[in-house]
Design a protein with these regions (language model features):
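N-terminal subdomain of lithium-sensitive/metallo-dependent phosphomonoesterases centered on the IMPase/IPPase/PAP
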Residues: 1-88, 164-170
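Residues embedded in well-ordered beta-strands
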Residues: 6, 10-13, 62, 82, ...
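Residue-level signal for inorganic ion chemistry
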Residues: 20, 43, 54, 91, ...
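Residues that scaffold the ATP/ADP-binding catalytic core of kinase and kinase-like folds
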Residues: 23, 93, 138
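Conserved protein kinase catalytic core
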Residues: 72-73, 92-95, 126
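Glycine-rich active-site/cofactor-binding loop and its immediate structural neighborhood
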Residues: 79-118
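Acidic beta-strand-loop-alpha-helix segment within the catalytic core
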Residues: 105-171
């Protein structure tokens, strides 16, 4: 199983975060996709940074990004391994300028996530992990292991969601 080194992917996430933050503190336009979700130059810029960097790092691994023209389902089903990317997760939060958005990069193998990274540019905090490496937080230049609690049978799941997606369906 291929597992990327954080030293290779952290700079990609941070560069995407820089592209986002360059737009965050200035006026920007908001477009709307077919599903009526917002799209900004920050989404597009972060997408380009990540897709180009992953293509250089792992040219044999396809990238499925929220902002790219998706391959057909038939093609995607043939992928045994791919990068799954949301270059700016929380565009509504970005637009409202509340700081609650992230850069998300995951490696999927045989339909299961094996490695993932979440970077919060406003907080300058990064979390990453995988089955083989555990879970880690990087903040203030320090990297520390964090604990992942296993779910105990019979206890309710704790789920975190965006305030902009709060509805009866998400409760």
């Amino acid at each position: 199983m291929f597992l990327p080194a954080i030293s290779e992917l952290e700079p990609i996430a941070r560069a995407a975060g820089e592209a986002i933050m360059a737009i965050y503190h200035q006026p920007f336009a908001v477009e709307y996709k077919a599903d009526e979700s917002p799209l900004t130059a920050a989404d597009k810029g972060a997408h380009e940074v990540i897709v180009q960097a992953l293509a250089r790092l792992t040219p044999d691994i396809p990238v499925l990004s929220e902002e790219s023209d998706a391959e057909t389902m038939q093609v995607r089903c043939s992928w045994s391994r791919y990068w799954l990317v949301d270059p700016l997760d929380g565009t509504k939060e970005f637009v409202s300028r509340n700081g609650e958005f992230t850069v998300n990069i995951a490696l999927i193998e045989e339909g299961r996530p094996v490695w993932g990274l979440v970077y919060a540019p406003v907080l300058d905090k990064l979390w990453y992990g995988g089955k083989e490496i555990g879970a880690w937080r990087v903040a203030d230049g320090e990297c520390e292991a964090i604990q992942v609690r296993p779910h105990r049978e019979g206890t309710p799941w704790r789920v975190v969601g965006s305030r902009n997606h709060l509805s009866q369906a998400t409760l």
